[in-house]
Amino acid sequence: MEREKEQFRKLFIGGLSFETTEESLRNFYEQWGQLTDCVVMRDPASKRSRGFGFVTFSCMNEVDAAMSARPHTIDGRVVEPKRAVAREESAKPGAHVTVKKLFVGGIKEDTEEHHLREYFEEYGKIESTEIITDKQSGKKRGFGFVTFNDHDPVDKIVLQKYHTINGHNAEVRKALSKQEMQDVQNTRNNRGGNFGFGDSRGGGNFGSGPGGNFRGGSDGYGGGRGYGDGYNGYGGGQGGTYLDEKQNLYSSGNFGGGPSYGAGGGRGGYGGGPSYGNQGGGYGGGYDNYGGGNYGGGGNYNDFGNYNQQSSSYGPMKSGGNFGGNRSMGGPYGGGNYGPGNGSGASGGGGYGGRNRY
């Protein structure tokens, strides 16, 4: 039997005691299954624990079992496990933010809220579902939201990028509020350099390559050209905001296009291509008022795969940058030495998310 891809079997463990070793980490998580890998990340010079690590199980069911048994206490300390983000996804702003709300794109006219609930309830307890409609025409705008009572269902769902709902392909993303997107941008601004992934040709861009700036303004986080490395026009377009049913403000920009939908033309909409096209190739109007910014190309910031202990930054990266910074990424995995390093453009002192120090 072929083993599931590693990205579905790996957990990031934040908040580790500096006394926790790979042996104690392994002993704790082996109660839910067989581990194929276990590592505590350490400073390459001092060999001191950096306060986080990874465990990889033999199958995803074991990961589910472990996450269902939270909270986890190791060596007298409550740790914060989270499904690891794959390399190709970790380069995108907001990939590490912890949210309970899921964005669902590709919703067709014949798809109702009960279809969303029926499909996603197998992942966790759902608090609400919403399909966005045009206030004037009443027609569906092609996207919606599902809110869970926990972040783990969202993390699990986005690992599998495409889903089939009511017979139609749908794309899922974490739904980031405008404040969460602002936190992401503030992290970049306060870090003072390249975001720590890509090949830095864009000069401090979230996405590498010319014109791939993640820039904000009064109209949200749109603008600029998306870096077309497999995600032509992902982001870009004009900015704006969106209020959901609870009057929560969500940030802007067209949702962008992915390779399975064609080459996102015109306004950088979700898709492009004649079969989806309107407004210059944007899918359903390009998902105006949601998305946000240029998510850029693939990048090389890696919190998932290769544990390069010789690198001072969190995983190997071609830019030499660093994912840390003085501001929070909005997630629960904070401070200490999650992100600091000697990479170019890195200010250090920051964290993978959340609190400044444990």
From Swiss-Prot:
Q: Which InterPro entries does the entry link to? A: HnRNPA1/A2_C, hnRNPA2B1_RRM1, Nucleotide-bd_a/b_plait_sf, RBD_domain_sf, RRM_dom
Picking any one GO biological process from the record gives:
mRNA splicing, via spliceosome
Domain called RRM: residue spans: 9-92, 100-179
Stretch list, region Nuclear targeting sequence? 309-352
Q: Which CDD domains match?
A: RRM1_hnRNPA2B1, RRM2_hnRNPA2B1
List the keywords (alphabetical): Nucleus, Repeat, Ribonucleoprotein, RNA-binding
Task: From the UniProt entry, list the residue stretches annotated as the region Disordered.
Answer: 182-217, 333-358
Q: Which domain of life is it from?
A: Eukaryota
List cellular component terms (GO).
catalytic step 2 spliceosome
Q: Where is the composition biased (Gly residues)?
A: 193-217
Q: Name one GO molecular function term.
A: mRNA 3'-UTR binding
Q: Where in the cell is it found?
A: Nucleus
What is the documented function of this protein? Forms complexes (ribonucleosomes) with at least 20 other different hnRNP and heterogeneous nuclear RNA in the nucleus.
Q: What is this protein called?
A: Heterogeneous nuclear ribonucleoprotein A2 homolog 2
What organism is recorded for this protein? Answer: Xenopus laevis (African clawed frog)
